[in-house]
Design a protein with these regions (language model features):
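Nucleotide/pyrophosphate-binding catalytic subdomain
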Residues: 1-187
Length: 187
């Protein structure tokens, strides 16, 4: 082993010892999956952390891919001050793209790195409990006018049920969770 690698290991060892067995949540945009090389680079780093005993939960979004799919299918999108209004049709597309394509792409890249990962949405195992976001007062930056906006099926997280996640982590699986949640009525 050359001296620079040995020095790097000496530098990393205290951190590995400190964080081994600890759980970290890594959140990234769905944009990461657009470029396979970027995704493979990120999953290489996640695999390294996982292999030295740092427990990871990955949470991902997918707003850009959702917009692209909506455009391809002719589903109109409403964005107010940079925030998406999620109507019924958009929610159906979000389920497809978040829990489907993006989650699967991340799982495949982790498998490429030898990591056993499990794909979930926040709805699976009741992991993410959310409530529908109430209408909000939004100020239009261009006009200064204030309006009340209902963002539709956009929710706010109120609780994380870690039971399933802990079960997976205790068995050396890496959970990959799409940013979908539900309320007590399953909506």
């Amino acid at each position: 082993m050359n001296q620079s690698k040995l020095d790097l290991l000496r530098e990393a060892l205290p951190y590995i010892q400190k964080f081994k067995g600890k759980t970290f949540v890594v959140k990234f945009s769905g944009k990461v999956t657009e470029d396979r090389e970027n995704l493979l680079s990120l999953t290489e780093e996640l695999a390294l952390l996982h292999q030295v005993g740092i427990r990871l939960c990955v949470i991902h979004g997918g707003g850009k891919q959702l917009t692209q799919l909506a455009d391809q299918l002719g589903v109109a999108q409403t964005v107010i001050e940079g925030r998406r209004v999620t109507d019924d049709d958009t929610l159906e597309l979000a389920k497809m793209i978040f829990a489907g394509k993006i989650n699967t792409d991340i799982l495949a890249a982790l498998r490429n790195r030898g990591i056993e990962a499990v794909g979930l949405s926040g709805i699976d195992g009741d992991v993410v409990k959310a409530v529908r976001r109430p209408p909000k007062e939004i100020t239009n930056r261009q006009t200064g006018a204030t309006e009340t906006v209902d963002f539709g099926h956009v929710g706010d997280v109120v609780e994380i049920n870690a039971r399933l996640l802990n079960l997976l982590l205790e068995n050396d699986y890496l959970p990959v969770i799409s940013s979908l949640g539900a309320d007590d009525e399953g909506r």
